[in-house]
Amino acid sequence: MSSVFRKILVTCALPYANGSIHIGHMLEHIQADIWVRYHRMRGHEVWFVSADDAHGTAIMLKAQDLEISPNKLIKNIRIEHQIDFSNFKISHDNYYSTHSLENLYLSRKIFTCLNEKGLIKEKKIFQLYDTVKKIFLPDRFIKGTCPICKSKNQYGDNCEICSATYEPTDLINPISVISGKKPILKNTKHLYFDLPSFTNMLKKWIHSGVLEESVIKKTEEWFKVGLKSWAISRDAPYFGFKIPNYPNKYFYVWLDAPIGYISAFKNLCFKSKKLNFNELWNQNSNYELYHFIGKDIIYFHTLFWPAILEAVSFRQPSGIFVHGHLTMNGLKLSKSRGALIKASDWIQYFDSDSLRYYYASKLSNKTHDIEINLEDFIQKINSDIVNKLVNLAARNASFINKYFNGYLSDKLSNIKLYKYFVNTSSSIEDFFENREFSFIVKESMRLLDVANQYINEKKPWKIKRTEENIRELQNICTMGINLFRIIMIFLKPIVPDLAIKTESFLISKLTWDGIKKPLLSHQINKFFPLYKRIDVEKMFEFMNICR
């Protein structure tokens, strides 16, 4: 166990409940899950929650298209999402929904608090209205040219190219996504949260160590142009929570969605007797709170969300970890853009560890985009996992099983080399803590090269099976098995399925404390295939369904 015991809550951004989980969603959940699994291995108390973002016009319209109720739609989608996350071994303690009694209660309670403090203002505005569908258009149902960078085909709330936020009415040449027609401006009233009054607090908070430097710079750009009051209401028809005392007004999804982090934890408290809701969310909490998000929602999490928490005297996040977009052939994979690879399709062709490992090999604590290339993917999995990692175990286990009835020696053939591997754990720990997962993969592969080189130099297959030499053979192969074991301990949070198979093969749990304690005079199982090589033909089959 790590020397200082920590209590941690981790969240991922909430997938929208109008469609399938794609491998872009999975990037974030895998990143968070690796971090969570590592800290659990170190003996910390770690809770991991997320939820479906289950409100909005898009859900209402999707349900209408399917001729089912919105409630039925979000129920079906949540089940599908839970299956997808389970297939990729995402270890949520609670995967909830924003359409819940807890979220209704907390959204109304927080709104009432904001209103009583004079932080909610009602304004008359002009809003884009679809005369064909007779509906006020939400941000994501309007496309046009970004008023800042002039990029075309951008949504009505923020630009995916320059990350600017703006009002839908600021778009140049707006078009309704629903009808394809140009909307008109229509008068309505909306409720606004007084975000500008938190400018000084937010300027101080973003420099408190919670954000990576590039995220700070991005956030500072919004201070330069000045923060604007934030609309938190939407007009009927809408699927969501009604705002008390405001007929035909509903909470905007960006109010009740982040509150979903809190409600998912509140629901978890009902399920677990170990947890106390107020212990985590009070301003003096000794829990750590981390949000994993994509760079397209930085504004909401570094400005709007901390201002809301400050206003209602809830604790602030300890860190907001931002990743880049997932791209293929240079294009962002996005459900809203209609360019995606569904997680359920992926798992029909490849196992979950393969994607987890591939993502880990590219992930850092920076916001750079991650390019997925299927040829590179197959080469990396077959080379790293099959040829290097599993082969190290196989070539040593064959001798241990054949000549020693599965028993490892009572000594290692090279104590100095074993200690060298053990000493690398300190840098691996730093890499995990700082989410530099690509460095963990690189270091593990470097160690594998060292281990395989050691076995190649010793050439156990050439050692004569005499009474004099048989002991040396056992010591060498015991050394090889133990070096494999250390590397698998390092990789356990990344490839949990392979870790389970390895534990079965070794008849020993892979624990962080076990790094310093080699397996000696210990019987292992007969070796069995731990990982299957990926067939190139599978890649071509998969590429066909992705077109």
Curated annotation (Swiss-Prot):
For whether the record's keyword set contains Oxidoreductase, the answer is no
Protein name from the UniProt record: Methionine--tRNA ligase
Where does it primarily localize? cytoplasm
Q: Which residues cross the membrane?
A: none
* GO BP, sorted A to Z: methionyl-tRNA aminoacylation
Against PANTHER family, the record matches this protein to: METHIONINE--TRNA LIGASE, METHIONINE--TRNA LIGASE, CYTOPLASMIC
Q: Indicate where this protein resides in the cell.
A: Cytoplasm
| Signal peptide range in chain numbering | none
Determine the domain of life of the protein's source. Answer: Bacteria
Per its UniProt record, the required cofactor names are: Zn(2+)
Q: Can you quote a single GO CC term?
A: cytosol
**Keywords noted in UniProt:** Aminoacyl-tRNA synthetase, ATP-binding, Cytoplasm, Ligase, Metal-binding, Nucleotide-binding, Protein biosynthesis, Zinc
**Can you quote the record's cofactor note?**
Binds 1 zinc ion per subunit.
* Short sequence motif named 'KMSKS' region, residue ranges: 332-336
Any GO MF annotation of the entry? metal ion binding
Short motif ('HIGH' region): ranges: 15-25
Q: How does it assemble?
A: Monomer.
- Membership in a protein family: Belongs to the class-I aminoacyl-tRNA synthetase family. MetG type 1 subfamily.
Which NCBIfam families does the record associate with it?
metG, PRK00133.1
Question: Where Zn(2+) is bound, by residue?
Answer: C146, C149, C159, C162
